[in-house]
């Protein structure tokens, strides 16, 4: 990411309105939102069209280091959007920003997840890909602590992994899977998408979202 430009609040509100009035989605994911006003407008609009599962992926910084959330927007994220969520899916840097604590271990992930859980969502999935060793994600809920371990794939092409797994979780919830199975299936999916990712250009390449539909996998 080298540059970003915000859409107007009006077009974002209209997009939500048109989709929700047409198909009444069972699950909705909110990803990158950059400004305090857009966050507030999204929350106000979603209040008019409640869904069963709201997944919030608090995207803040791109893989290339580009800031995607204005500093002044963090408070609205915490105050308005996170409390509405069925599940919040921060990675380590995002969770550190939200909780103002350093996260270096799985136990730290649990502590940070509980801080975010107290902000109002039903579940928090702490994505541990930034830690060393196996890819360990931690699901925290009321009286729940579940560890999901996954294979670490030694490839540089991980652009979009966080957005992809949160979208996959949203899709599995909409299909009727419970929260644990939605996460398990989504982790399997993103692991394979990274394994068969694309070498394009000189930067961090994209994962291969459609690897299942190709007879010959791209390596």
PLM regions: where:
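Conserved phosphate/ATP/ADP-binding segment of small-molecule kinases
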Residues: 71-145
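Short, charged, surface-exposed loops that flank catalytic or proteolytic processing sites
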Residues: 102-109, 174-184
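Short pre-catalytic strand/loop immediately N-terminal to key active-site residues, enriched for Gly-Thr
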Residues: 145-159
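Short, small-residue alpha-helix embedded
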Residues: 97, 155-179
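Charged C-terminal helix
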Residues: 181-219
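Conserved N-terminal subdomain of the carbohydrate kinase-like
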Residues: 1-63, 67
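Active-site-adjacent loop and "lid" segments of alpha/beta metabolic enzymes
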Residues: 1-12, 64-71, 131-139, 159, ...
């Amino acid at each position: 990411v080298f540059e970003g430009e915000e859409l107007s609040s009006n077009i974002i509100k209209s997009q939500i309105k048109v989709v929700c009035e047409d198909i009444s989605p069972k699950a909705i994911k909110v990803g990158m939102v950059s400004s305090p006003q857009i966050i507030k407008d999204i929350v106000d609009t979603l209040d008019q069209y409640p869904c069963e599962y709201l997944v919030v992926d608090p995207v803040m910084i791109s893989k290339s280091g580009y800031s995607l959330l204005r500093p002044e927007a963090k408070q609205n994220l915490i105050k308005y959007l996170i409390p509405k969520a069925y599940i919040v899916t921060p990675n380590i840097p995002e969770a550190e920003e939200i909780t103002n604590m350093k996260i270096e271990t799985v136990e730290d992930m649990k502590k940070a997840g509980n801080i975010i859980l107290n902000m109002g969502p039903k579940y928090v999935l702490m994505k541990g890909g930034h830690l060393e060793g196996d890819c360990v994600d931690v699901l925290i809920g009321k009286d729940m602590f579940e560890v999901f371990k996954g294979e670490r794939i030694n490839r540089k092409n991980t652009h979009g992994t966080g957005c992809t797994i949160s979208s996959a979780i949203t899709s599995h919830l909409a299909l009727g899977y419970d929260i644990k199975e939605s996460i398990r299936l989504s982790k399997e999916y993103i692991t394979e998408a990274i394994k068969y990712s694309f070498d394009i250009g000189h930067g961090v390449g994209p994962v291969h979202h459609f690897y299942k539909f190709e007879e010959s996998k791209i390596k």
